[in-house]
Amino acid sequence: MEPTRDCPLFGGAFSAILPMGAIDVSDLRPVPDNQEVFCHPVTDQSLIVELLELQAHVRGEAAARYHFEDVGGVQGARAVHVESVQPLSLENLALRGRCQEAWVLSGKQQIAKENQQVAKDVTLHQALLRLPQYQTDLLLTFNQPPPDNRSSLGPENLSPAPWSLGDFEQLVTSLTLHDPNIFGPQ
């Protein structure tokens, strides 16, 4: 695993440990206010933290599937396939006192990049942390597109290593709430 850094999210209302070298996408292009998006400096990998409205009509594993399919619809996925959905142990989460249930999902979505016709199978790992007291579903996503076949610009050992599932797990387990006022009046 790469060295890491503790990073403020949503104006300091949250923080989490991100892999070293993660680039804040909001420095490159507009990002919706309910998202924090980070990209790998070399690969097409990305990490996304989203504050979403609680989907109270779905519970348990179905809630994780709902958000996975919703993301696929937003991204215009041509196909979505869930590989696994598992409950996430609350005791491992920094948000354990606030999170009522947590799920982790792995799957694939067939997505074409902007201005490209060919769709690629992108592996997605998602963690859904449910905070009903704040009417919020926290969705964390790790996008792992297939490796690019372009040759590296420099010696192999100078390029940062791709992020691993361990990097994503560290993001999920380290996510900490510092200011509940981000959710508005309760």
From Swiss-Prot:
Function statement: May regulate the intracellular trafficking of RAN. Promotes guanine nucleotide release from RAN and inhibits binding of new GTP by preventing the binding of the RAN guanine nucleotide exchange factor RCC1. Regulates the levels of GTP-bound RAN in the nucleus, and thereby plays a role in the regulation of RAN-dependent mitotic spindle dynamics. Enhances the expression of SCN5A at the cell membrane in cardiomyocytes.
Name of the gene this protein is made from: RANGRF
Keywords: Cell membrane, Cytoplasm, Guanine-nucleotide releasing factor, Membrane, Nucleus, Protein transport, Transport
Family affiliation: Belongs to the MOG1 family.
Protein name in UniProt: Ran guanine nucleotide release factor
Signal peptide: none
Subcellular location: Nucleus; Cytoplasm, Perinuclear region; Cytoplasm; Cell membrane
Subunit structure: Monomer. Interacts with RAN, both RAN-GTP and RAN-GDP. Competes with RCC1 for a common binding site on RAN and thereby inhibits RCC1-mediated nucleotide exchange. Forms a complex with RAN-GTP and RANBP1. Interacts with the cytoplasmic loop 2 of SCN5A.
Keyword Membrane: yes
Taxonomy of the source species: Eukaryota, Metazoa, Chordata, Craniata, Vertebrata
Organism encoding this protein: Homo sapiens
